[in-house]
Each structure stands twice: as structure tokens, then as C-alpha cells.
Design a protein with these regions (language model features):
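Aromatic "clamp/platform" in nucleotide-sugar-dependent glycosyltransferases that forms part
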Residues: 279
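Donor nucleotide-sugar binding/catalytic pocket of nucleotide-sugar-dependent glycosyltransferases
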Residues: 146-183
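Nucleotide-activated donor-binding/catalytic signature segment of Leloir-type glycosyltransferases, i.e.
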Residues: 240-259
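A conserved mid-protein helix/loop that constitutes part of the nucleotide-sugar donor-binding site
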Residues: 30-35, 202-217, 234-237, 324
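Conserved donor-binding/catalytic core segment of Leloir-type glycosyltransferases
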Residues: 187-206, 212-215, 228
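Short His-centered aromatic/hydrophobic patch
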Residues: 101-108
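Short hydrophobic beta-strand element within catalytic cores of glycosyltransferases
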Residues: 296-299
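Short alpha-helical donor nucleotide-sugar binding micro-motif in glycosyltransferases
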Residues: 258-259, 266-271
Length: 388
């Protein structure tokens, strides 16, 4: 018997709660969640953040000034049924009628357990943030309680349609919004190219150690290159140690640590090139944000890349692991900085009319209202809350 863990529907519209399964640690899902919740509240749509404990040893974004955060003790990643029962009081305290669990078995398990209370009237919106087996397994397992599935790229939406053919009407695409320059950029051709990476400093998924190979390759080429590395993660010490031991005559590197999301716009605006080595993505937020500020993206051929980048016109796409091609593209751009300016302004134009905040927020609220008009979530009592 589950009691006292239901959510009272608010007056005046849906009340949404987003889960941060590993707290406010560095990552695109975190920055998207923090920014969207803030905008929703500014537009009088009630939103709360359920902030779980962070990964051990990871830096977190500062959130002392946030009134929309409720802290939940315990890491949701890999949480078992006992931990999930412990999360219930916090989830109940947000009094939401729409939940967005994001990427964790523990967060989906908690809302599934909540739904077993017959007095609860909740809906679940499942965001597929990455073209990854984990997401597809997660959403397939919890399909019984999900009202809407939102893919962040066409690749993801196509995959969802294949694995969930009975839910075609409940699958939609919503691409992240970004800030876009209102004017063209005029880079200083006399300065070295500034190449920026913004994201998790992690080998898993991000393949961040490819950065070392890129440095080595550029060190053997003509030109001068300045790198800015913004982020935190388990491979940060390895990267900094490598650069401390290895001197490059034409490659300089700044490690900026975890940069607040609101400062990233200026960082992209002061950079010439953005890079992404990822093994898989959904629709890289750093790629979109950098393009909006006129950075030329050089990224791997993952979900979202070909959807937003025309190779050679609004950026460059290389195969995963093909660092040599990435280095050659950077060297060629250094030798022809007029082309950097041309592609930079093409990037700004390509995202200007497709990633507005107001349009995104209106579409998101529309999805919430469609969910509220449908049936409430109810987990099958014969199915385990989390897989055995």
C-alpha cells in the first residue's frame, strides 16, 4: 500500500517537475533542464527541479539563488527499489502533475511507484536526449506510464517510431533553443585560431582523449592554435597532466574548469571553432550554441550533426575517431581565415530562425497540455518497478 505520495494538480495549468538524476553536474541535459525550468517560471508556468545527489568528486553548477530546486538525497543512477522508496517523499513534495525523469532508471522507477497510488493523477513526458541504446531500453521498459515521447533529433524520432509502432501519435521532435547573434562576425585574422571544447571531460561518449591526438597532429603543422577547454569530468586531470609534461611551440591551451551556462555564450562568441569528438549524441547543445555565436563546428558523424550541418558550408563532419581529418580541416581553416568568417556567418544564419526560445517554450507547454488532457499514468502492478 502506497500512501501520502500523490500530487495535487495545481490551479491554473500543469505543474511540471524535472529530475536531475546526478544533481547539477556538468552536462547538456543539466543545462537544458536548469534553463528551461527558469524560463517556464518566468512565464508563469509552475516548474520545479528535483536535484539528486551528484556523482562523487564531480563539480556542480551553482544554484544557491534558485527557488525552484528541491534536493533529493541519493544518486538516482542505478538506484534500487529501496532507494526509490526513499525518494518518494521528495517527489511528492513538488506537487507536480507532470514529471520529466530525464535519463535514469531510478527517476523513472520513482514516478512509476508513485503512479500506483490510486489518488495520484500524474503524467510522464519522456525526453530522449541521446541516440543511445540506454535511452531506448529505458523508454521501452517504462512505456506504460509515458504520455509523450520527445526526441531531440530526427534520427532519434525515427528510432522511437521503429521500436514503439503503437505510439506513433505520441512521438514528437523538439530541438533545443539557443541564443543567436543578431549580426555577422568580423574575426581578427591576425590572431591564432581559438578552438573551444565545452562539455564533460570524459572518455565515455565524449572521447575526450582524442584531444591529445589532435594537439599532437596540429603541433606538426604550420600555424598557431589556441584551445579553450570548458568543463569538468574524470579525464580532466589526465589532460592537464599531459599538457604540463608536453610543450608545444604552436599550440596553447587554457583549462577553464566548469563554466556557468550563462557565461558560455560569451565564450563561444570569442572562439572561432568548436569541436566535438563524441561517439554518440542526440542533438549536441554545445554544437548548436556555438553555431549561434558564429563558431565553425567540427564534429563527428553522430545524431544531429547532418541534420544541422552542411559539410563545408556550415561546418564540418568527420567519422568518429578520425582525428587526422579534424586536424587537417583546422589547419586548412588557419591558412584561409576568410573562409572561417564566411562559414561563421553561414552558421549564424542557419540556426537563427529555427531555435528560438519563445517558440520552443510554446511547443513545450503545448505538449504538457496535451498530456494533461489524456489519461493519467498507471504502472502495471504485475511488472517490476525496476528491471531485475
Amino acid at each position: 500500500m502506497i500512501s501520502d505520495h500523490c500530487n495535487t494538480p495545481p490551479n491554473g495549468g500543469p505543474r511540471v517537475a524535472f529530475a536531475l538524476p546526478a544533481g547539477s553536474t556538468n552536462g547538456g541535459v543539466t543545462t537544458w533542464t536548469l534553463a528551461l525550468s527558469k524560463r517556464l517560471n518566468q512565464k508563469n508556468h509552475s516548474s520545479k527541479l528535483i536535484c539528486h545527489s551528484a556523482w562523487p568528486g564531480r563539480a556542480t553548477f551553482k544554484s544557491d539563488d534558485r527557488s525552484d530546486i528541491i534536493y533529493c538525497d541519493g544518486l538516482a543512477w542505478g538506484a534500487g527499489i529501496d532507494a526509490i522508496r526513499g525518494f518518494l517523499p521528495t517527489y511528492s513534495a513538488v506537487k507536480a502533475n507532470i514529471f520529466i525523469p530525464n535519463w535514469s532508471w531510478g527517476t523513472y522507477g520513482t514516478v512509476s511507484l508513485m503512479s500506483l497510488n490510486e489518488d495520484c493523477d500524474i503524467r510522464v513526458i519522456a525526453f530522449a536526449h541521446s541516440d543511445q541504446d540506454h535511452y531506448y531500453e529505458l523508454l521501452t521498459y517504462y512505456e506504460p506510464i509515458i504520455s509523450k515521447f520527445v526526441g531531440v533529433s530526427e534520427t532519434i524520432c525515427q528510432h522511437l517510431r521503429c521500436i514503439l509502432p503503437s505510439r506513433l501519435n505520441d512521438i514528437c521532435k523538439l530541438m533545443y533553443p539557443v541564443t543567436v547573434l543578431n549580426e555577422s562576425r568580423k574575426p581578427n585574422h591576425k590572431k591564432p585560431l581559438t578552438i573551444t571544447y565545452g562539455g564533460r571531460i570524459e572518455q565515455r561518449q565524449k572521447r575526450i582523449l582524442d584531444l591529445i591526438a589532435l594537439w599532437e597532429l596540429l603541433a606538426s603543422k604550420k600555424g598557431n592554435y589556441h584551445f579553450k577547454i570548458a568543463g569538468d569530468g574524470p579525464q580532466l586531470a589526465q589532460l592537464t597532466e599531459h599538457f604540463e609534461k608536453k610543450e608545444y611551440s604552436n599550440v596553447s591551451i587554457e583549462f577553464l574548469g566548469l563554466v556557468a551556462h550563462e557565461r558560455m555564450t560569451d565564450l563561444w562568441a570569442s572562439s572561432d571553432i568548436s569541436i566535438l569528438f563524441s561517439e554518440f549524441e542526440g542533438m549536441s547543445i554545445s554544437m548548436l550554441e556555438s553555431m549561434g555565436q558564429g563558431c565553425v563546428p567540427i564534429v563527428t558523424d553522430v545524431s544531429g550533426a547532418k541534420e544541422k550541418i552542411t559539410h563545408g558550408q556550415t561546418g564540418f563532419i568527420v567519422a568518429v575517431g578520425d582525428v587526422a581529418s579534424m586536424a587537417q580541416i583546422i589547419a586548412d581553416l588557419d591558412a584561409n581565415k576568410a573562409r572561417v568568417e564566411q562559414i561563421s556567418n553561414a552558421c549564424i544564419s542557419s540556426v537563427r530562425d529555427h531555435h528560438g526560445f519563445d517558440t520552443y517554450d510554446q511547443e513545450f507547454v503545448k505538449i504538457m497540455r496535451e498530456c494533461i488532457s489524456g489519461p493519467s499514468a498507471e504502472w502495471p502492478r504485475s511488472k517490476a518497478i525496476v528491471p531485475n
